[in-house]
Amino acid sequence: MSSLNQYIRPVKSRLSYISFIRNISITQSSINSTIKDNESISKTTTIPENIQQAKELAGYRALEVPEFKVLGSTSNGGNSTSSSCSSSILSINVPPSVPIYIRRGSLLSIYGIQEISSIDSVRSQLQFPNFWQRLIYGGYISGYQKLISTTPFSLLISSKSRTIMNGGNSSTEKSFVNLILDGTTDWAILDKSALQVYTGNSLSITMHKLPKFISKKLSRSLKNNNNSSNKKLETGLFSWKKMGYTLLSGRGKIGLVGNGNNSGCSIYNINLNQDEEILINKNNLLAITVNGPYDLQNCIIKYQFPIINNSNNNNNNNNSNNMTKNIKESGNIVKPKLIEPTTWNLIILKIKNINNRIKKFFQFINKYTLNLKTTSYNYLSGNQEFIKIIGPRNLLLQSNINHNGFNFTTRRKQQQKSIWPTTTDTTNTTTTKVDNTSSTPKDYLNYVTIEPDKGAIFKSTSDFSETIETIEKKKKNKGKDINTTPI
């Protein structure tokens, strides 16, 4: 073994000085510098910092429920009475396989579709929900476009529809308000053109008849408080022009539109507490919370501003004053004396009886025409459509009223506003007077004379006889050559 070690040791020492080197060559394709130049030339987008004061719309992809967002809205979270400032565009982010219903003619844009999907994945279908009920109760037909896709996408919805049947020619501005139904409360929509967008698999939309009279429950409570008569009280909602309302129940999301102005808030939310009352014009009432389809008659009463009946009050006051005077003057009750009637006394008695009968006749007419007076007074003063709502309720009010029909005058006024300037400068005001005196038109000829001292002189005349005489006189006097060239 020792002999083998002698031979192995020098070999190991030599191997330790040997190093193995491996050469690896990497081939790389040459980069052409013109590619970047071509990309910069054909670039069609810019960085977001270059676009200012414009809200960016991004399509969301990880969604389970639709998202409604009113663009440009502000809300007062701390106040009990909150308002949504007017905005005419609604942005909706829709998850896959969730249908959304949009009023026909209100779709602005479909975006948020990238390379993972295509526009062909969005399916559209036109539907007319509650066709016969809306035609009978409201006298109108509303078409809704159903959109559904297997991939997420986003929408932009306008508050005004472009179709004529849905108020496309309306001159009033509209704005959005969003409602979330969680199944605990229902909403009664009183404006037929308010429902713009809705979604929800368990959302129920039905049409019901507006109640004409209040319920027995409400009438009993009013009798206990005011001791009123047994006459049936009206709700003030029913009319032959408008006989129905839309009931929203279940779970889902709704986008309502109300009439107003873009310069300020147009839809307001009012929260009524228990036994709290409010007077509202029924045309401005957009929606109200209810508990089922038969709850409107439990909270709404027609209101008429009362008229003070001066004749009855004066008669009652006079009778009471006479009674008090007789009691004060006569401490002791005096028995009436029997007097033999004369013919004159009989005549006076008959006149008094006729006078009393005439008074009773006019009091009877005044009593039964008081209702006619109040209705005519409220109609002339513009208060004939007021209703009283008793809480607890949530109300949505719109600041303007939409008048249906073609309005050519407003369109003509808008055209005039676009032609004529909206502001006038009061500092620099100049008045021009037009001379209406008749004058006969004349033909004038222009000519130029070249003189060595003055140069070219331009003149206009209707007759060359005078100019020729002056030129000849100058030739005789000065003896200079004057060249005249007509134009």
Curated annotation (Swiss-Prot):
The keyword Transit peptide applies. It is found in: Mitochondrion. It comes from the Eukaryota. Keywords: Mitochondrion, Transit peptide. Pfam families: AIM24 (PF01987). InterPro entries: AIM24 (IPR002838), AIM24_sf (IPR036983). GO terms for cellular component: mitochondrial inner membrane. Its main location: mitochondrion. Residues 1-62 form a transit peptide. GO terms for biological process: inner mitochondrial membrane organization. Belongs to the AIM24 family. PANTHER family: ALTERED INHERITANCE OF MITOCHONDRIA PROTEIN 24, MITOCHONDRIAL (PTHR36959:SF2). This is Altered inheritance of mitochondria protein 24, mitochondrial.
